[in-house]
Amino acid sequence: MAFTACEKQTIGKIAQVLAKSPEAYGAECLARLFVTHPGSKSYFEYKDYSAAGAKVQVHGGKVIRAVVKAAEHVDDLHSHLETLALTHGKKLLVDPQNFPMLSECIIVTLATHLTEFSPDTHCAVDKLLSAICQELSSRYR
């Protein structure tokens, strides 16, 4: 998937925002996922699935840092995400349908926190997250 110069610039700005508080954004995204799609909890053994949960914050931080790193490699997502795709597809056996659900939660979280979340920004972020989902799903089983 090719990204325009404008999309890359927008994605870079959003990545900078996410990089400032990866645990906070990530925990909110995961907590939102667990509420809206309770079946996604089956991959995690947490006592507290809220954004305040320590394990939710740790894993949420990992997720957001991975998105930030992917944003830095938009021209070669396939190579950049290969190891992560293998881990989720072969070792953890995460159903690929979970990735778009989490992507929606990331977009909603961004939209609730950013004062400027224009349709163009939404489209650029959605395009990045869709490409990430596609790559992560490529090694399923």
Curated annotation (Swiss-Prot):
Residues 2-141 form the Globin domain. GO terms for biological process: hydrogen peroxide catabolic process. PROSITE patterns: GLOBIN. GO terms for molecular function: haptoglobin binding; heme binding; metal ion binding; organic acid binding; oxygen binding; oxygen carrier activity; peroxidase activity. Signal peptide: none annotated. It comes from the Eukaryota. Belongs to the globin family. The gene is HBA. Heterotetramer of two alpha chains and two beta chains. Pfam families: Globin. Involved in oxygen transport from gills to the various peripheral tissues. It comes from Mustelus griseus (Spotless smooth-hound). This is Hemoglobin subunit alpha. O2 binds at H59. Heme b binds at H88. Keywords: Heme, Iron, Metal-binding, Oxygen transport, Transport. Red blood cells. One of its GO terms (cellular component) is blood microparticle.
